[in-house]
């Protein structure tokens, strides 16, 4: 950035900036607990290939139109979540994170049954597809959670609420506990969606590009109890 101090000085002439710390806003307490996912053999092998490709790109021996660091970064993000995002021929056993997320979501679901506590799962990768269009993370998570005994009616995708009326209805269902697990991307669920009334946990499967997108339910006035948030397979309590 150039002339940033000057820009901020001009901005402050017309803006009144108040942070949550300055206002002493009530927010729930949070403690971060890292839950690591071990690489499977399939992930290790593919990661080694990405390193080799990266070295080739740095040496200039590869045409950027055929392979480049942006492509490698995208594949690495997919690898970290589920290998089937790279190639549907891989199996569930070639991944650990998905099952860890399912374990955490089910645990919190059972623990919060009395209060109808709700949860959100954020993933910007592997968003829902129509049947027959290939593998996606959202439907895989839903199927695995249903296999654990969670009613499918209590699981929803924010992507299905494609009108204001449907979004308002979805918000009411989540706030009432009728829907207890909501999956969303950062774009569709990060702001402007008021579903915090019973929210107990938020799980981030991938790392958002902006740090401010992590821990959304900590920035609401409506939460009065401690919460759990997961970031990239890590649980934050």
Listing of model-derived features with the role each one plays in the protein:
Residues 23-51, 186-237:
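SF2 helicase/translocase ATPase core recognition
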Residues 114-116, 178-179:
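Short, high-confidence coil segments that cap the C-terminus of an alpha-helix
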Residues 1-91, 107, 237:
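Inter-lobe coupling linker of SF2 helicases/translocases
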Residues 126-157:
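Conserved helicase motor "Helicase C" RecA-like lobe of SF1/SF2 P-loop NTPases
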Residues 16, 42-44, 52, 78-86, ...:
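Short, solvent-exposed loop/turn segments at secondary-structure junctions
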Residues 151-186:
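Conserved helicase ATPase core of P-loop NTP-dependent helicases/translocases
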Residues 117-125:
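Conserved RecA-like ASCE P-loop NTPase motor core of nucleic-acid helicases/translocases
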């Amino acid at each position: 950035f150039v002339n940033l101090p000057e820009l901020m000085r001009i901005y402050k002439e017309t803006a009144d900036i108040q942070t949550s710390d300055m206002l002493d806003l009530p927010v729930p307490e949070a403690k971060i607990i890292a839950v690591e996912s071990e690489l499977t053999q399939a992930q290790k092998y593919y990661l080694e290939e990405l390193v080799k490709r990266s070295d080739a790109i740095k040496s200039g021996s590869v045409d950027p139109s055929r392979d480049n660091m942006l492509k490698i970064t995208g594949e690495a993000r997919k690898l970290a979540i589920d290998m089937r995002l790279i190639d549907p021929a891989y199996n569930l056993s070639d991944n650990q994170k998905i099952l860890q997320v399912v374990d955490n979501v089910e645990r919190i679901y059972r623990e919060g049954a009395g209060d109808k506590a709700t949860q959100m799962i954020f993933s910007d990768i592997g968003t829902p597809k129509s049947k027959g269009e290939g593998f996606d993370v959202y439907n895989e998570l839903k199927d695995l959670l249903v296999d654990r005994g969670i009613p499918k009616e209590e699981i929803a995708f924010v992507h299905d609420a494609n009108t204001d009326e449907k979004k308002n209805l979805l918000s009411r269902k989540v706030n009432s506990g009728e829907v207890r697990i909501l999956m969303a991307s950062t774009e569709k669920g990060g702001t402007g969606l008021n579903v915090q009334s019973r929210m107990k946990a938020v799980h981030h499967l991938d790392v958002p590009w902006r740090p401010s997108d992590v821990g959304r339910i900590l920035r609401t006035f409506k939460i009065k109890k401690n919460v759990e948030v997961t970031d990239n397979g890590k649980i934050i309590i």
